[in-house]
């Protein structure tokens, strides 16, 4: 092998296109886009023998696993023999000069790059000969081609405990943990999530990222937890509401009992008041009957006394009696034809009135006049007005 040709060395060190395909990267758990690998003419010549073997994951035939592993060259030996720090090809510009001193090596901690590939095609071939190996580790010390693996999928410096997985020769198979490949975020799960995942029979890794199925399971579990929490909250609110209603009912029932007691007391008081009222009504009825009888007797007595006493007081006694000198004749307002009977009646009435008005001496004179008239064979004639009436009749 001529190591002086840098392009051929690059072509040999360049993996096939479908090594870092999307499926291989997803199987490794590396959620990063596959790098675009530029294919040159010499790379096509170097990979022509690989691609002609078959359509497996690495482009290998089932009978050529050893030849595939021999194609990888340890870059540490190449850089250790003759390599300049500024040259990316891994060889010096003048490989024919054996007298050139080797380039001084850096005193800093060695930088190691590992490319991990899941060789699924090799599992079937190595099933009978030995244990199956799922990962291939290739050490690329101090050689960082940008077209192979992006920066997010590479580890610039390995920890000290990672040197235990580094084998002295390239192409050897060694299991490399995922923590040494890229910095992963830790997945924190609560006790409830762990319990539900255990019930589902699913065990999630402790680091992100997760696969689609694992994400679906985790979302389902968290949705169950949220539904459970919301149901618990609703039950708690319902219980608080019911407790509040029960407390209000208890308070209302206690107040109702107190009011019932007050109502009973008021009813008893009302009954006593009604009994007292009836007693008063009976007493008033008895006293009212007695008073009515007494008052009736008093009124009858007073009325009888009034009937006895009032006739003795005549209202005509205070008036002076009219004498004959006080009499004045009046003119006749109308001419009437009077019969003898009417004349006598009128005369009698006038005589009675005159006698009542005349003093006692005049009464004696009237009596003598009456007797005189009776002796003459006729009724006594009134004086004054009576003579005027008779004179009018005669006319």
Curated annotation (Swiss-Prot):
Ranges per topology, Lumenal: 317-395
Xref: SMART domains: BRLZ (SM00338)
Region (Leucine-zipper): 259-280
Domain bZIP: 217-280
Region (Disordered): 79-110, 354-387
Subcellular compartments: Endoplasmic reticulum membrane
PROSITE patterns xref list: BZIP (PS50217)
GO BP of this protein: response to unfolded protein
Post-translational modification: Controlled by regulated intramembrane proteolysis (RIP). Following ER stress a fragment containing the cytoplasmic transcription factor domain is released by proteolysis. The cleavage seems to be performed sequentially by site-1 and site-2 proteases (PS1 and PS2). PS1 cleavage may be suppressed by a determinant in the C-terminal region.
Key words of the record: Activator, DNA-binding, Endoplasmic reticulum, Glycoprotein, Membrane, Nucleus, Signal-anchor, Transcription, Transcription regulation, Transmembrane, Transmembrane helix, Unfolded protein response
A Gene Ontology cellular-component term: endoplasmic reticulum membrane
Membrane topology: Single-pass type II membrane protein
Regions annotated as coiled coil: none
Glycosylation sites: 366
A GO molecular-function descriptor: DNA-binding transcription factor activity, RNA polymerase II-specific
Main location: endoplasmic reticulum
Bias (Basic and acidic residues) ranges: 354-377
Subunit text: Binds DNA as a dimer.
Function: Transcriptional activator that may play a role in the unfolded protein response. Binds to the UPR element (UPRE) but not to CRE element. Preferentially binds DNA with to the consensus sequence 5'-T[GT]ACGT[GA][GT]-3' and has transcriptional activation activity from UPRE. Binds to NF-kappa-B site and has transcriptional activation activity from NF-kappa-B-containing regulatory elements.
Protein known as: Cyclic AMP-responsive element-binding protein 3-like protein 4
Native organism: Macaca fascicularis
